[in-house]
Amino acid sequence: MTQVAKKILVTCALPYANGSIHLGHMLEHIQADVWVRYQRMRGHEVNFICADDAHGTPIMLKAQQLGITPEQMIGEMSQEHQTDFAGFDISYDNYHSTHSDENRELSELIYTRLKENGFIKNRTISQLYDPEKGMFLPDRFVKGTCPKCKSPDQYGDNCEVCGATYSPTELIDPKSVVSGATPVMRDSEHFFFDLPSFSEMLQAWTRSGALQEQVANKMQEWFESGLQQWDISRDAPYFGFEIPNAPGKYFYVWLDAPIGYMGSFKNLCDKRGDTTSFDEYWKKDSSAELYHFIGKDIVYFHSLFWPAMLEGSNFRKPTNLFVHGYVTVNGAKMSKSRGTFIKASTWLNHFDADSLRYYYTAKLSSRIDDIDLNLEDFVQRVNADIVNKVVNLASRNAGFISKRFDGVLAAELADPALYKTFTDAAESIGEAWDSREFGKAIREIMALADVANRYVDEQAPWVVAKQEGRDADLQAICTMGLNMFRVLMTWLKPVLPQLAARAEAFLNSELSWDAIQQPLLAHKVNPFKALYNRIEMKQVEALVEASKEEVKATAAPVTGPLADDPIQETITFDDFAKVDLRVALIENAEFVEGSDKLLRLTLDLGGEKRNVFSGIRSAYPDPQPLIGRLTVMVANLAPRKMRFGISEGMVMAAGPGGKDIFLLSPDDGAKPGQQVK
């Protein structure tokens, strides 16, 4: 089916320029790259761009810590990021920075248009100020309890638990991330973008049917709670662009960050000497398609602020947002202590890029679901699918063609009907790639790989090769096998660019989507070389260990209690739920004859008495003051027979030992027998 060539601009969210790329980042860039490569194979004009998000207080402060300028730090980080993405074969047409002339000009242009159109409001606000550091505190440099869902340890601009946005002054019990001080309030004039003016437009955009259902539903919640004016300014000191005609005021990073998509594309057009494409892609009535691949944590900014800014400054809105979930490793959040917080560069020291690209692709869909990188399953799936099914199909047939027929394929297929079954699947597989139902595409491809391998099993070319007068049959069977391999690799080319390049070299033919309608016949292939090696669990073990060592090498020396007594390995919630902690009243406390370490405690659990031996005598040489205190005990610990009697539980205490042991006590109001949760 002939497709009309489309003009498409694709972006990934801009990585922040103060840290390395890790496997969580790579999910998005791989997802977008697979989609882009498929679109290019179908003949569409695709511009794939990204940039580093290079502004904000975190970058300014980190550069100060490193003793370098912010410009030097973001320059070094940009090179590192680009090296990582190139290592994973992310096929960007341009990778730029938000700290650029193009981005400054476009940010000022959009701001000026918004201001001229009446969408920028000025007002004086009370703002949190760090009295120790002498600076206003940006959103991300205040932490406290979310005013909406009451989750602790949340940043000052939005809650990572419930997704709500708010001002830093709304936080409960705020603390400065910079110094730990309790901030004070000071007045400052700020500039606000009038987001509520765009509510009707945004709701119509939401109802257009283009957005993912989960995104549209979340946006509807925000509409129902009411849109608020958005503070787009920050006070000096700040690393970013100064607002025109407003000395000491800077654009908030989230204003100029998405404009970085435009800046990167403008930079690409200028490199090409192209004076028309920028306007063609970004003008109000553009027929080009614009897609943003983003994580679910930044939907608010991309679905509300960004399209409203574009609308208010007379630019086009995105065609769609493609939102994905988070990455977990072995069923849990990535962990530095467990070695599962894995940098992209570390991965490439132990595995090739294709392996991770394949595993992520096999698990992705168009929904906003989290993806678990189970490292054991990863090894099994890569070996089972890529090695045993796809590559094995080529290796089982290539040797006979090379040795017996000088590398020349037969003039006819052994089973044209079977080959048509393969080519007929192109439409459904293509639709799966196009709609980002990547897992579905992989399942269809692997099902056909099974069909191809069954064909080879049934035809048994190794048997035919030993039978006289059957050379033509042997050549036709192996030609059929290699043509099915060619079709499979064509479909997998967007996912496995390195393997696809090796397959093209072997087949002596480019893997083209439309070309599979014509099989390779009477065609000379090159001598077969191993296309892909099996991977092993020992590589995973080395990867995890290397990640742990990297953390040790870069982490600040740990001092205090954690240095002497590190946190234990993570347990599951089910494991924790087995421990029954109860409030207990100490009815009696006395020395244990024959022991200089133990005290015998008689505990009341609110109707049940327990006898507990506890090694706290060194900290409590006079046990009498303990009588009448409340403490916490493990109530379901199996009784333990000791030389002095049976201990029926364990009381909870902290400290390194000796005189520094501190028996835990609940707050006033707790009662014996109550469960500690």
UniProtKB/Swiss-Prot annotation:
Pfam families: Anticodon_3, tRNA-synt_1g, tRNA_bind. InterPro entries: aa-tRNA-synth_I_CS, Anticodon_Met, Met-tRNA-synth_bsu_C, Met-tRNA_ligase_1, Met-tRNA_synth, Methionyl/Leucyl_tRNA_Synth, MetRS_core, MetRS_Zn. It is an enzyme of class 6 (ligase). SUPFAM superfamilies: Anticodon-binding domain of a subclass of class I aminoacyl-tRNA synthetases, Methionyl-tRNA synthetase (MetRS), Zn-domain, Nucleic acid-binding proteins, Nucleotidylyl transferase. The keyword Zinc applies. Its cofactor is Zn(2+). Binds 1 zinc ion per subunit. A motif ('KMSKS' region) lies at residues 333-337. Residues 575-677 form the tRNA-binding domain. Coiled coil: none annotated. One of its GO terms (cellular component) is cytosol. A motif ('HIGH' region) lies at residues 15-25. Keywords: Aminoacyl-tRNA synthetase, ATP-binding, Cytoplasm, Ligase, Metal-binding, Nucleotide-binding, Protein biosynthesis, RNA-binding, tRNA-binding, Zinc. It is found in: Cytoplasm. Signal peptide: none annotated. Its EC number is 6.1.1.10. One of its GO terms (molecular function) is metal ion binding. One of its GO terms (biological process) is methionyl-tRNA aminoacylation. Zn(2+) binds at C146, C149, C159, C162. Homodimer. Belongs to the class-I aminoacyl-tRNA synthetase family. MetG type 1 subfamily. This is Methionine--tRNA ligase.
